[in-house]
Amino acid sequence: MSEHQYILALDQGTTSSRAIVFDHQGNMKGVGQQEFRQHFPKPGWVEHDANEIWSTQIGVAQQALSNAGIRASDLAAIGITNQRETTLIWDRATGKPIHHAIVWQDRRTAPYCDSIRAQHEKTLQDKTGLVLDAYFSGTKVKWLLDNVPGARERAEKGELAFGTIDSWLVYNLTGGELHITDATNASRTLLYNIHTGEWDDELLRILDVPRSVLPEVRNSSEVYGKTAAGLLGAQVPIAGIGGDQQAATFGQACLERGMAKNTYGTGCFMLMNTEGEAVPSQNKLLTTVAWQLDGERTYALEGSVFIGGAVVQWLRDGLNIIRSSTEIEALARTVDSSEGVMLVPAFVGLGAPYWDAYARGTMVGITRGTTKAHIARAALEAVAYQSAELLEAMQKDSGVELKELRVDGGASTNDLMMQFQADILGVPVIRPKVTETTALGAAYLAGLAVGYWKSTDDIAHQWQEDKRFEPQMSEEERSKLMRRWKKAVARARDWEDDSEA
């Protein structure tokens, strides 16, 4: 076997670290996966131990190589994709984190966001394409600097480094040599100007973050450096970085304007390619960098739903309605409909197009005849309804009418949910042969940088359809259900107020 036959993708997710080896055809050759602990120190707070993230990530990388029956010397490159916005600060001298990582789902900075909203929201939105929300990294960085004893002074002296998870992985992979991020991850911090492609002094001033902690922003596809000697058995080029949702968009080959994908993971994330135009949203969507190749930025509109597949975990762990996540489809299929039950899973507030931090989970339409099967079905449908609202907003903003939706992520294997998604959208929903599109996108980014794949055309030709779900619902029925859904959402909104939250 000649060397450099494969690409290794590191996929650092919210609940697990994974690694996948891909070949030239984009087929998976070996996989490693390990869950890690979620820490919930207070209501609304979510943290990860960054050392555990690193140890599980390097562990699964070795596992994937061994499962593929190859060595590090067989790799052409490594690509990295990561849970976005999750925020970490470490000591440059020791490489030790000064606190647990604050996860994207964490709401501790919501009151701070409210306090600066009137004065700064417009500036932040115009420059970053984001809404002012606790979800993004900037306010988390400020919280760490203000709440970890001595952190701000040490940051001013240049002793500390901030990074999203991609930065932390590259730092550790290179033995502390590189402190970098890519444009997609930088575009999720509230500190980066998506129009100039640089960290922005005005944004840094608003959020009180010193420039000295920031990583260098690089392309999403270029050779950044090599893995440290002794780490994997050979020094491998690290050549691609993309935030998970952007990487999935690339892996789904949504390479032209108006192409869109939806990833059904813990949350749901829909991105539509808008090419070189950073389309400002009038409907509370995000404008974000989709990828940056050779200094050229491609943009996307993004809508995020906080609770997607996580609603199934709640049925399993919170209500014990199912024993394992895989049982939900069979249970939901035992009834023909939810019999009018609507479940709005606003467990941590609502994302796009509402951005309501004070909404809470709500179930309406329950009668004595309601069973766990109706609740299971309502839970699956809730994911599709939330995604339909994102698409509605996207079409309004972009002026592009969607022809099809490409889907991926864990819950996209649920045929019942995908059929309902097509019904409620009124467009075909298409699942590709390789549903690990996040990791595949990272592999593509890395492979392009080292010439393993020659061009984005190569990538577009690799994408293959596995199953197509055609809409089967009448326009009248669709409108009726969407009206009912919006009524249910209205019941869930503004539930907590500041004084109670």
UniProtKB/Swiss-Prot annotation:
CDD domains for this protein: FGGY_EcGK_like
Pathway: Polyol metabolism; glycerol degradation via glycerol kinase pathway; sn-glycerol 3-phosphate from glycerol: step 1/1
Keyword Iron found: no
Chain positions recorded as glycerol binding sites: 84-85, 135, 244-245
Positions that bind ATP: 14-16, 266, 309, 313, 410
Catalytic class of the enzyme: transferase
This protein's UniProt keywords: ATP-binding, Glycerol metabolism, Kinase, Nucleotide-binding, Transferase
InterPro entries reported for this sequence: ATPase_NBD (IPR043129), Carb_kinase_FGGY (IPR000577), Carb_kinase_FGGY_CS (IPR018483), FGGY_C (IPR018485), FGGY_N (IPR018484), Glycerol_kin (IPR005999)
GO cellular component annotations of the record: cytosol
GO MF annotation, one: glycerol kinase activity
Record flagged with keyword Magnesium: no
GO biological process, one term: glycerol metabolic process
EC number: 2.7.1.30
Annotated catalysed reactions: glycerol + ATP = sn-glycerol 3-phosphate + ADP + H(+)
Activity regulation (UniProt): Inhibited by fructose 1,6-bisphosphate (FBP).
Residues where sn-glycerol 3-phosphate binds: 14, 84-85, 135, 244
Superkingdom as given in the UniProt entry: Bacteria
Residues annotated to bind ADP: 14, 18, 266, 309, 410, 414
Family: Belongs to the FGGY kinase family.
Function: Key enzyme in the regulation of glycerol uptake and metabolism. Catalyzes the phosphorylation of glycerol to yield sn-glycerol 3-phosphate.
PANTHER family hit by this protein: GLYCEROL KINASE (PTHR10196:SF69), SUGAR KINASE (PTHR10196)
Name of the protein this chain belongs to: Glycerol kinase
Species in which this protein is naturally found: Deinococcus radiodurans (strain ATCC 13939 / DSM 20539 / JCM 16871 / CCUG 27074 / LMG 4051 / NBRC 15346 / NCIMB 9279 / VKM B-1422 / R1)
